[in-house]
């Protein structure tokens, strides 16, 4: 074990009982959140193995770190392990979970293991319906710029680090807090961020929005009395919750009553410029290397966290200006030459109507002269059903729309909540005539006829559409890379 690993194996240092844990097994190890925690643990010196249904970039990276990866779930693969980590996406009848219980091997949720990593560190937990990955990445980048050398666990690839997780040589742990299954209630951070609260993952909350809101309050009350809640006052639901939070609160937003306020927002292509206003100090000019008002809010959250920790403005401003982005968050994949001219290709993970609307707005602001062509893959039948009218309205705002089949994420189809239904409803609005395609082959043959010179082509969604964007970027359409 390297000196850094030995020095910062804090689970063993602070919890002597963790010394009896030598081999940790992850079921569903290829997920971004699961893989991130696995990477931190293997760098702390634990033996790691795990399984998933297919290889991906996460499993390939973990293999390079010495993690044993199994493709497919089989009962014998958990034999000899000391603890099994699982996400709530894994079915209770999974043979590895069944075997672990029969063998009396402890089974813990992903968030429980993250909570153990955070227990003896200065934890910063970022929660909210949208913006978690970007905000967490910005905070981690600022702390790295300030030589705080944080440990971080992020739900997307931080381009500057080449990974979504890293074991740092300090007391700081910066991580996303997942409300989708209410597992963020396991966390006990020193700083909690709430970016916004909207109806999503409502099956977890029995369709009760009030229960979702009260769960966020419970999350904030996991802070110690000396902790800090950083909250976006621009979000109406977050603003409503402020009087109910019995902890120190720092607010941020464009609103005049925000503690950390942005003024004079201007977007220039990919970058966003604004004036930062805080009580008791001079205004300063800030540029964040991300497009859109929503990303200014994410930057304000990171500034609020850093300011509370007395990080110098110089490090904050430099980190935001030099930010290299996150995989699949308005990720520019290049400009390509087609038979009809040049096309700019952007890939984005957003899959909630508000996220898609923010992406469209950023594209319009940064590239107002470009025709916006979107390939959208709905994510989950339940989300499409619950937010159907919002999707119809938002998707009608592009110039050309191509709809792929719903990425089910394991859900059974819901009648009337599929892409063909969306196509019909959008067409009935009369703003544009969407195109439904049943598969990748049909799409790839269609695109050369659809695209025009100067287009901005946006691949949008949380399913496997990211693979499709790479297919396009790898010249499968006969494109020639220009930049």
Swiss-Prot record:
EC annotation from Swiss-Prot or TrEMBL: 6.3.2.8
Domain of life: Bacteria
One annotated GO biological process: regulation of cell shape
Binding site for ATP: 128-134
Keywords: ATP-binding, Cell cycle, Cell division, Cell shape, Cell wall biogenesis/degradation, Cytoplasm, Ligase, Nucleotide-binding, Peptidoglycan synthesis
Subcellular location per the Swiss-Prot or TrEMBL entry: Cytoplasm
Pathway participation: Cell wall biogenesis; peptidoglycan biosynthesis
Molecular-function GO term, any one: ATP binding
Reactions this protein catalyses: UDP-N-acetyl-alpha-D-muramate + L-alanine + ATP = UDP-N-acetyl-alpha-D-muramoyl-L-alanine + ADP + phosphate + H(+)
Gene Ontology cellular component list: cytoplasm
Xref: Pfam families: Mur_ligase, Mur_ligase_C, Mur_ligase_M
Primary role: Cell wall formation.
PANTHER family: UDP-N-ACETYLMURAMATE--L-ALANINE LIGASE (PTHR43445:SF3), UDP-N-ACETYLMURAMATE--L-ALANINE LIGASE-RELATED (PTHR43445)
Family per similarity comment: Belongs to the MurCDEF family.
Name listed for the protein in its UniProt record: UDP-N-acetylmuramate--L-alanine ligase
